[in-house]
Amino acid sequence: MTTQRHYSPIDRLLLQADMAMRTLLPFSGQPYRPSPAIVQPEAQMSDEDTRHVAGLMRINHTGEVCAQALYQGQALTAKLPQVRQAMEHAAEEEIDHLAWCEQRIRQLGSHPSVLNPLFYGLSFGIGAAAGLISDKVSLGFVAATEDQVCKHLNEHLEQLPAEDEKSRAILEQMRIDEEHHAETALEAGGFRFPAPVKFGMSLLAKVMTKSTYRI
């Protein structure tokens, strides 16, 4: 029989600060699972392809920064304990993606986006606001966000050079995990967002992808 842990508001604030540092500081996010890229050979790519892949992986890394902040914000304001636990568990799984993307970016001779703190703060606020409205809306936001992430992953998989098996292995596993997160959120009672809301979310996502591809 497992014992549910109860945290005071100060405890939760300290946990949020710890998670923020683990998300934003270089090399601080330690994955729970080894990177799928480990077993893949390093490809010989042109400088142009290497820069392009680094840009794609930088976008994906920032996407995971946003996911971390979103889940943490929702966990802070979630009303039901089981929803809070689901948000915290999803955030732990996203740590893997965060670390895998950063590892790959470094292997490609590049760096994460300097805009990550900005996007973390914005996403944390959105997540906390969604949690304040209702757990149903909060879970629905997770599902809609993960759907958007999967679309980006599919686009990036199509753009990867055929020989880059390392990046491909990472993105394919990320897609599997994100699809599972979306399904779990809906099964837990998440609200299915209408198309206009999803369209607005896609416009915001474009701002992130365009800005973080290079910086």
Curated annotation (Swiss-Prot):
Reactions catalysed, as given in the entry: a 5-methoxy-2-methyl-3-(all-trans-polyprenyl)benzene-1,4-diol + AH2 + O2 = a 3-demethylubiquinol + A + H2O
Keywords, sorted A to Z: Cell membrane, Iron, Membrane, Metal-binding, Monooxygenase, Oxidoreductase, Ubiquinone biosynthesis
SUPFAM superfamilies associated with the record: Ferritin-like
Membrane topology: Peripheral membrane protein
Pathway the protein contributes to: Cofactor biosynthesis; ubiquinone biosynthesis
Matching NCBIfam families: DMQ_monoox_COQ7
Protein name as catalogued: 3-demethoxyubiquinol 3-hydroxylase
